[in-house]
């Protein structure tokens, strides 16, 4: 019987996840199907329960349900506990396992696809919301020289930094006066077509500016290019986090490069 998987979100029609997982399944010969399900804002838990009762084997979770999925899971992986959010669920005899593959996906895209080593590099993480929290531990595991979290509300960045051990600190945008090797935009500003108030000097020589958003050019990427930085959007992260979820579910690791290339074509 074909195993069922799905991604749950609100909105969800724009999701590329069904296309990505269909490509992974073809590539690896897995008998599975994957769909996008619009969950009501007040009905996420019920939607997941219904899907599992109908034989669903696992699910991805996107905005705005990742924190709710964290609370729903019976068991959590260590990286999900650190992230405080869940983007991958697996249903088994012991209940619901919650995982978070976002940070692993980001690091895989940066170090693998983009060939940007992070060890001994200075990294600036812009934003202090859920998207930022989900990637901090995997970034710190790469042993950067320093990870700086910058946010409009400095206290939020400080509270976030206190949750983790390592070479990291928090500051406001006005305190950014030194160059970085990698600048990651984890804010929702790009969704609104806005630019975080970054000073141009954050982009060091040969710096990479990375926007977690994908699908269109953003003011952040245009600003970074105008100040000499290399740029990348979050499409590779999307595919890499999907590959990590696929591996959790199926025990097979797909080749992401052809899938990323097909989505960019």
From Swiss-Prot:
Residues at the active site: 66
Any Pfam family matching the protein: Shikimate_DH
Entry binding sites for NADP(+): 127-131, 151-156, 212, 234
GO BP terms in the entry: amino acid biosynthetic process; aromatic amino acid family biosynthetic process; chorismate biosynthetic process; shikimate metabolic process
Residues where shikimate binds: 15-17, 62, 87, 102, 214
EC identifiers of the protein: 1.1.1.25
A Gene Ontology molecular function term of the record: NADP binding
Subunit structure as annotated in this protein's UniProt entry: Homodimer.
Xref: HAMAP family: Shikimate_DH_AroE (MF_00222)
Protein name: Shikimate dehydrogenase (NADP(+))
């Amino acid at each position: 019987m074909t195993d069922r998987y799905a991604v749950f979100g609100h909105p969800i029609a724009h999701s590329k996840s069904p296309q990505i997982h269909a490509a992974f399944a073809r590539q690896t010969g897995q008998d599975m199907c994957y769909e996008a399900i619009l969950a009501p804002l007040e009905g996420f838990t019920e939607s997941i329960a219904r899907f599992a009762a109908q034989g669903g084997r696992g699910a991805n979770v996107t905005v705005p349900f990742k924190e709710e999925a964290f609370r729903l899971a019976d068991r959590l992986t260590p990286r999900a506990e650190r992230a405080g959010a869940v983007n991958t669920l697996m249903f088994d005899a012991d209940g619901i396992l919650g995982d978070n593959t976002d940070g692993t996906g980001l690091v895989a895209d940066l170090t693998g696809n983009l060939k940007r080593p992070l060890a001994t590099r200075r990294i600036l993480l812009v934003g202090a919301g859920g998207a930022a929290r989900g990637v901090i531990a995997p970034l710190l595991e790469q042993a950067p020289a320093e990870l700086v979290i910058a946010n409009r509300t400095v206290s939020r960045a400080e509270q976030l930094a206190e949750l983790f051990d390592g070479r990291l600190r928090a500051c406001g945008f006005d305190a950014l006066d030194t160059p970085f090797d990698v600048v990651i935009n984890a804010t929702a500003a790009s969704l609104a077509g806005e630019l975080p108030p970054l000073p141009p000097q954050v982009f060091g020589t040969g710096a990479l500016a990375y926007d977690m958003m994908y699908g269109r050019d953003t003011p952040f990427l245009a600003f970074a290019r105008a100040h000499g930085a290399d740029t990348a959007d979050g499409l590779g992260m999307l595919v890499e986090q999907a590959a990590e979820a696929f591996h959790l579910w199926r025990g097979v690791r797909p080749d992401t490069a052809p899938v990323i290339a097909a989505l960019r074509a």
